Each structure stands twice: as structure tokens, then as C-alpha cells.
Amino acid sequence: MENLAWSPFKSLTAEQREQIDRFREQLLRFNQRVNLISPETEDTFRTRHLLHCLTLTARDFPAGCTVVDWGTGGGLPAIPLAICHPEATVVGVDSVGKKSRAVRTIARRLGLDNCFTWNGRADEWTGEAHYSVSRATAPLADLWAWHRRVAVSPDDPNGDAWPPGLLALKGGDLSDEVAALHAADPDARVERHSLNDLLGRNGFFGEKEIVAVRS
């Protein structure tokens, strides 16, 4: 991790590092009973899951904002974001009850008062959010439709923050997804940020990117 061009770990406080380590321990413990992540990826959790999610912290989330994580699964990226942004509210939405309950318990054990879960379909959540995030959950057009339904603008986003909207962790050929998104909403603005460029490494992150969508 020390050879990364940019590393989210360097800016973490000692308390946040401890919370990250405890999150890994708790998630792997729950994973023995609930399928939160693939067992084959447990040994590479720090890279394949944690670092992947923390690339979203390359830019800021304003204090007081609400972030909704569609299909949070094992709390990825909801819990890492809640750890790194204690002044933001993070809501993990998942339709699988046992996953939602596991994430709720993990967040409570980590002392994350800013992290919540909601069990149900994404298109039925009735809250409001300034940002939506997602990791391997649904096509961009669906994610954007879910975000637009609940979107509100931050009061005063700072210049270092992500523009309000959708931030999706994606990989592979996205041409069809982007085309479908623009067919559904021709005015949607899409920015694509290569994780390989951000992190300065090949391998797992070679074709992965953050897709930022905003109005």
C-alpha cells in the first residue's frame, strides 16, 4: 500500500485506522454466517474491498451531507465512508434483511453514530440524499433514477467536494451502460475517473473507475 501514487490510508487518524481494522474483523466474522463478501476475497480484503471503496474519498463529502449506498451488502462502501467522514450521514440500503442487520450491528459495534441501514428495495426508500454511491449493484441508468428520486442539493458544497450526484464504482466496458443512461436522461453529465490513474497501479484496478453522474 505504501507505493500507491495516492493513498487514502495516509490521511486516516489513529482512531479511524483502528475502526477500519475492527471493521475488517467484524465483517469476516459475520461472513462465516452471512454471505457479505465472497469467501475467496477474504485474504485480499484490504485491496479488493477496502481500498476500492476508499477511492471515493479522493474528494471530500461536505459536513452535514447525507450519502445513500444502494445495495450496501457488507457495508461497502457505507461503513468505510462513515468512518472517514464522521460529519456526514451514511445510509446503507439493501433488500436482504440479514445483510442489513449484520451491517447495523457492525456499525453499532464500531461506534458509528452516523451510519444507518434500511432494509428494502432501493426504489422504495423514502429518505433524501445529497449523494448516492454504489459498488457492483445495478446499471448506471437504474442508479441514476434512484438518485434523482431522492436527491437534494447541499447547502454549501466546498470546492474540494464531489459535485452532488451519483458516484458509482464500476469496471469493464461501460459504453452500453453510459448510452442507456443518456437515453433515459440526455441531460445527465458523466465524468469517469480511472482508479489506475488515481492509485498508480495495475492488476485489480486496471479497468476500474469512479463514474460520477450529476444533473
From Swiss-Prot:
Residue ranges that the Swiss-Prot or TrEMBL entry lists as coiled coil: none
Keyword Disulfide bond carried by entry: no
Molecular functions per Gene Ontology: rRNA (guanine-N7-)-methyltransferase activity
Source organism, top-level taxon: Bacteria
InterPro entries: rRNA_ssu_MeTfrase_G, SAM-dependent_MTases_sf
Keywords: Cytoplasm, Methyltransferase, rRNA processing, S-adenosyl-L-methionine, Transferase
Compartments, as annotated in UniProt: Cytoplasm
Enzyme nomenclature, EC number: 2.1.1.-
S-S pairs: none
Residues engaged in binding S-adenosyl-L-methionine: 71, 76, 135
Cellular component, GO annotation: cytosol
Major location category of this protein: cytoplasm
Name of one Pfam family that matches: GidB
Job of this protein: Specifically methylates the N7 position of a guanine in 16S rRNA.
Protein family (similarity comment): Belongs to the methyltransferase superfamily. RNA methyltransferase RsmG family.
Entry protein name: Ribosomal RNA small subunit methyltransferase G
Organism: Salinibacter ruber (strain DSM 13855 / M31)
Lineage of the organism: Bacteria, Pseudomonadati, Rhodothermota, Rhodothermia, Rhodothermales
